Amino acid sequence: MGVKNIERLIEERQKIEPINPAELTLEEKVVEIRRTTRVVEGGRRFSFSTLAVVGDRNGHVGFGHGKANEVPPSIAKAIADAKKHLIRVPLIEGTIPHDVIGKYESAVVLLKPARKGTGVVAGGPVRPVLELLGVTDILTKIIGRTTNPNNTVRAVFDALLQIRSPEQVAAIRGVDEEKIRKNYRIYASAPIVK
């Protein structure tokens, strides 16, 4: 089995559910800037690759990658690419509806819904993705053996693409939507027990 192509999965989702970035008020965050050096006859040539995330803090988020000989053009390319790879994720009261595990190469990311007041318990490249998505309460864990932000962000998007809304789950199972919705609220509105 080959490596998942997250960009292709996002493009397939956009065919079903198109998102126009011009209609959204998007915020941008740069996750990583890498400098690579190529040695040529006259010395060294530098190029920069940037990983950026965009989101509207209301259920829409995207990531992109850009390369250029200078930092500002690589950031601009990454942001433009991120706007092409936007997805919509169903949120319930500031958290995700259910547990999900995303995988990409050696990166494995676990996302779990959390009660109100927990905050975004995430580190590294996972935090900007979830903050720009609009998640206010979530528990995360990077399980895989990787420190590569590119793979980690793609693993987060693999997890986000697996999230289903209560309506979608009810339609798949052929059950009453209210029954599903009641189970989804276990995490979101349960009182904190001391």
From Swiss-Prot:
Keyword annotations of the record: Ribonucleoprotein, Ribosomal protein, RNA-binding, rRNA-binding
Cross-referenced SUPFAM superfamilies: dsRNA-binding domain-like (SSF54768), Ribosomal protein S5 domain 2-like (SSF54211)
Gene Ontology molecular function: rRNA binding; structural constituent of ribosome
Domain of life of the organism encoding this protein: Bacteria
Record-annotated S5 DRBM domain positions: 26-89
Signal peptide: none
A GO cellular component annotation in the UniProt record: small ribosomal subunit
Presence of the UniProt keyword Phosphoprotein in the record: no
Gene3D superfamilies: 3.30.160.20, 3.30.230.10
The UniProt record lists the keyword rRNA-binding: yes
Biological process annotations from GO: translation
Function, as annotated: With S4 and S12 plays an important role in translational accuracy.
Domain observations: The N-terminal domain interacts with the head of the 30S subunit; the C-terminal domain interacts with the body and contacts protein S4. The interaction surface between S4 and S5 is involved in control of translational fidelity.
HAMAP family assigned to the protein according to its UniProt record, in alphabetical order: Ribosomal_uS5_B (MF_01307_B)
Quaternary structure and interacting proteins, as annotated: Part of the 30S ribosomal subunit. Contacts proteins S4 and S8.
Protein family according to the UniProt entry: Belongs to the universal ribosomal protein uS5 family.
Protein name (database record): Small ribosomal subunit protein uS5
UniProt lineage: Bacteria, Pseudomonadati, Aquificota, Aquificia, Aquificales
